[in-house]
Amino acid sequence: AEKLGIKCYDKELLELAAKESGLCEELFASQDEKPTNSFLYSLVMDTYSLGYTNSYVDMPINHKVFLAQFDAIKKLAERESCVIVGRCADYALEDNPYAVSVFIKASLDERVQRIKRIYELNDSKAADLIQKTDKRRASYYNYYSSKKWGEAKSYNLCIDSGLVGVDGAIDMILKFIELKEKNMGKDI
């Protein structure tokens, strides 16, 4: 985002979605990328999707939060060029011809080293944090999108930052955008 001179939205998206939806910002923080993966919960709470009710009022709170974020992502992309981290942004923008979806991966060992530096954790705690975060993100993404988290066909570009480094990943993304703009005949 910095090299493109555009904003990057991560947690900031929660505040924006809360403002635009009128829902309490704390709801977004508590539900952030945390769907339920309980089949029983879905059966009980998702009765509205089976035709028993069709009211937004009756919708489970995690669905309301997701829809508010989904709408905020679409509106944000219409207003400005930006980078949006996570929250199924690629799914929300899959019909936007200017969107570029990127998945960046690295080996667990490389990620542990990075997390240790950032959060001052030992190997075990860093690995545990990574695995729990990955599980939560995959569950959220797979639950709300028609895609699979981390699967190459779900994204325009997948990069192994362990092989090319952070700067190499940035260069690859910038080159991808440059080539897409050239192919489209306009700036994205």
Residue ranges of each PLM-predicted region?
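A conserved segment at the C-terminal end of the G1
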Residues: A1-G5
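ATP-dependent small-molecule kinase phosphotransfer cores
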Residues: L13-S81
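Small-molecule kinase domains that catalyze NTP-dependent phosphoryl transfer to phosphate-bearing small molecules
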Residues: E33-D46, N122-D167
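Short, amphipathic alpha-helical "lid/cap" segments that border enzyme active or binding sites
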Residues: F70, V166-L174
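RNA pseudouridine synthases
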Residues: L76, C88-N96
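Conserved phosphate-donor/acceptor-positioning beta-strand/loop module used by diverse small-molecule
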Residues: D95-I118, D123-Q131
